[in-house]
Amino acid sequence: MDDGVDKQAILDAALAEVIASGIDAFSLERVARRAGVDTTVITRNWGDRRVLLLDAQLSSSAQRVPIPDTGSLRGDLMALVQSMVALSQTAEGRRSMHRFLAASGDADLSDVRIDYWRVRLDELTTVLRRAEERGELRDDVDPAEAIRMFSGASLFDVVFADAPVRPEYITQMLDIFIRGISTTP
């Protein structure tokens, strides 16, 4: 980051702006105003709103839903689902998720959503690759496909039913998922 600019402050401002104003109203000018910097600073460092929004979403996810490394498949998946659910239970997390998932007439911002999930799912796949290295994952399980299934099942109620995720659902989903991919019953 050049110009002595606080990158995280701008990313935080970008995330706050998209949550407050929505994805369709998201602009570099609004983020610059919120961050207290000139628009040229943002343009010089990110180029356009698509890149800035993607970077802001990925930065937020990395902080709020870190990739766990507990040393066991069950421990990693439990830590992962707990942080995913915790974020989805906050008002900010729910607003951000719904706005980010909402259909937009803006092709660039639709691409952001696609790029976000491509990058984020690759990061989350680390959990299953580690399990594979420890011999905990069945040979016929594709870690990338399995983490997609896990993520979808983890947040099904939030995304499709607009309801909080129940603890008993998480426990049962995790048990079923692990039985399906693990080398041990």
Region locations from a protein language model:
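N-terminal intrinsically disordered/low-complexity leader segments
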Residues: M1-V5, P185
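Helix-turn-helix
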Residues: A9, A13, E17-V51, D55
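Amphipathic alpha-helical segments used for helix-helix packing
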Residues: V51, A56-Q57, S88-I114
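Short, basic, alpha-helical segments at the C-terminal edge of helix-turn-helix-like DNA-binding modules
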Residues: Q57-R64
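Hydrophobic alpha-helical connector segments
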Residues: V65-R94
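C-terminal peripheral helix-coil segments that are non-catalytic and often amphipathic
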Residues: A79, D122-E133, F160-P185
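Hydrophobic alpha-helical segments that form the core
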Residues: A102, R138-F160, E168-R179
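Amphipathic alpha-helical packing segments from all-alpha helical-bundle domains
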Residues: D108-E133, A144
